């Protein structure tokens, strides 16, 4: 499993906004601090605004801020928003059951791996990330 650039950047943006909280932060400032292009930053912000992780105010003096407290921004939820699924194999993330599930000797291992991954990321918040070096 590999987390996409979008997922990693979304987490960095949320940590940045949390660290520079209290007021509105211009998107260009976050982009400059995080080394993210303006175009890519706009895509990430649109996704985060849509799901309420970020609030945006347009116009003079506008900018962005967290849409909820950093301790309510769960890494697992954010990664599922940006990645779609944290399942390590396609058969666990599709709507239809895998035709080989009944005879597959590895499906149990993949399910457990997915459970461990979700439990791990669901136990971390943006506030926790602010404490790490």
Stretches found by the model and what they are:
Residues 50-53, 81:
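Residue cluster at the C-terminal edge of the helix-turn-helix DNA-binding motif
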Residues 3-5, 9-36, 55:
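N-terminal helix-turn-helix DNA-binding core of bacterial DNA-binding proteins
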């Amino acid at each position: 499993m590999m987390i996409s650039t979008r997922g990693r950047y979304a987490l960095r943006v949320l940590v940045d906004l949390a660290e520079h909280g209290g007021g509105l932060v211009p998107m260009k400032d976050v982009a400059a601090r995080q080394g993210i292009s303006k175009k890519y930053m706009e895509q990430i912000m649109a996704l985060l605004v849509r799901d309420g992780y970020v609030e945006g105010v347009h116009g003079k003096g506008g900018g962005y801020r967290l849409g909820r407290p950093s301790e309510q921004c769960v890494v697992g939820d954010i990664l599922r928003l940006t990645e779609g699924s944290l399942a390590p194999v396609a058969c666990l993330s599709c709507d239809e059951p895998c035709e080989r599930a009944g005879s597959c000797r590895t499906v149990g291992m993949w399910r457990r791996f997915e459970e461990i991954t979700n439990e791990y990321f669901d136990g971390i918040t943006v506030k926790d990330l602010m404490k790490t070096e």
